[in-house]
Amino acid sequence: MSKLQDVIVQEMKVKKRIDSAEEIAELKQFIKSYVQSHSFIKSLVLGISGGQDSTLVGKLVQMSVNELREEGIDCTFIAVKLPYGVQKDADEVEQALQFIEPDEIVTVNIKPAVDQSVQSLKEAGIVLTDFQKGNEKARERMKVQFSIASNRQGIVVGTDHSAENITGFYTKYGDGAADIAPIFGLNKRQGRQLLAYLGAPKQLYEKTPTADLEDDKPQLPDEDALGVTYEAIDNYLEGKPVTPEEQKVIENHYIRNAHKRELAYTRYTWPKS
């Protein structure tokens, strides 16, 4: 293992192996402990995309909220559907919601807000690329979730895990923004392992991962965008050997996207020693 890989493995907290029951208990305890420590929290808010990550986090949150209520703490889980117009994988969103069984479902179509933002910028002489518009979608989705959380005395739960964190494969202040990120410390295959243990429909964790943010490249697989497979990323995070080419791609993503893992730099935090 290279020196940088050792540093990254320590930072990303991924275990080489997990026990599903123990890991789920630990994740629920983290969520419950955070709520118990903040008496103002009356709701937890999460956008549900129909993908592996939000399905797993949604199920964990609902399980945690159920236990909190049994312990006398009044709390609600609000699952949010955030389509941009007509969502191509809407059926999978519904399957995820059936599996999660959230207390409440809110649907907000982000298309009018995103399109108006893009148009307003265009009128100001700022013409966004399709990729940049994709980031607008991600930020609008998170803005909606924070608006709901503010209105309902809640917090926003994130879906960031270590296989995304290492590569920076999320939008800064978009899907990378949240109050808590329960599944940080898991890689992609471990998320699949937990969903299988929880009895999720296979298609929800065996489907090809995609952010699906670009109009010109609908359903673009994450692995195509990253230039490396999740299998390689997961192996790297577990301290296993990968090819020199895979190592270079992963470490370049890690270095280039360091700013996404930090809050705004100050004169005391930049440059780093």
From Swiss-Prot:
Q: Name one GO molecular function term.
A: ATP binding
Task: Output the superkingdom of the source species.
Answer: Bacteria
- Residues recorded as binding deamido-NAD(+), renumbered to this chain, are R139, K172, D179, H259, K260
Query: Which BP terms from GO are recorded?
Result: NAD biosynthetic process
| Record's protein name | NH(3)-dependent NAD(+) synthetase
Q: What class of enzyme is it?
A: ligase
List the InterPro entries. Answer: NAD/GMP_synthase (IPR022310), NAD_synthase (IPR003694), NH(3)-dep_NAD(+)_synth (IPR022926), Rossmann-like_a/b/a_fold (IPR014729)
Q: Which family does it belong to?
A: Belongs to the NAD synthetase family.
Query: What role is this protein assigned?
Result: Catalyzes the ATP-dependent amidation of deamido-NAD to form NAD. Uses ammonia as a nitrogen source.
Query: Subunit comment for this entry?
Result: Homodimer.
Q: Where does Mg(2+) bind?
A: D53, E164
UniProt xrefs under HAMAP family? NadE_ammonia_dep (MF_00193)
What residues does ATP bind to? G47, I48, S49, G50, G51, Q52, D53, S54, T159, K188, T210
Point out the gene that encodes the protein. nadE
Q: Which reaction does it catalyse?
A: deamido-NAD(+) + NH4(+) + ATP = AMP + diphosphate + NAD(+) + H(+)
Q: Which UniProt keywords apply?
A: ATP-binding, Ligase, Magnesium, Metal-binding, NAD, Nucleotide-binding
Q: What is its EC number?
A: 6.3.1.5
Q: In which pathway does it act?
A: Cofactor biosynthesis; NAD(+) biosynthesis; NAD(+) from deamido-NAD(+) (ammonia route): step 1/1
Where does it sit, as one GO cellular component term?
A: cytoplasm
Q: What is the lineage of its organism?
A: Bacteria, Bacillati, Bacillota, Bacilli, Bacillales
